[in-house]
Amino acid sequence: MWLINHTYKLLSYFLRKASNRFFNSSSSSFSCSFLVFLFVVFFSDCFFSITSFLISFGILSSFLIFSLFCLGFLTVIGCLASALSLSSLSKAKIGFSSSLSSISPEGSLKSEEMLEDDEDKEFSSLLYGTSYVFAISFK
């Protein structure tokens, strides 16, 4: 359950970044790499659903090698696509946060650099936690 929660937090982080770039850019050009990332996330989500269904009925024994290969392939493609989308989104220099997170503890408004640092710290902690869980589960 913890892994699913972190996965959805990562996905919402990417969606928030992409929607900011899409709605705030003057040319309204959407990142192709982010579309690839969404495609990979959708199919990997379908893959996890099918795999968990097969595990629950004990059919996975003959399907195990193929599923691990597909999982590794989708993970590599997802990481590459997310890295590309993050690099293109970071070039846009668009900060986004809710009104509560844009106020510092002293009561003054945070600068855009501070907001981007907060979002980057949140993303790196989510990514580290998720990769740690994957490393433990495959040991």
Curated annotation (Swiss-Prot):
UniProt entry tagged with the keyword Transmembrane helix: yes
Transmembrane stretches, start-end: 35-55, 57-77
Keywords: Membrane, Transmembrane, Transmembrane helix
Subcellular location: Membrane
A GO cellular-component term linked to this record: membrane
Superkingdom in the source lineage: Eukaryota
Keyword Transmembrane helix: yes
Membrane topology note: Multi-pass membrane protein
Note: Partially overlaps IST1.
Protein name: Putative uncharacterized protein YNL266W
The species this protein was found in: Saccharomyces cerevisiae (strain ATCC 204508 / S288c) (Baker's yeast)
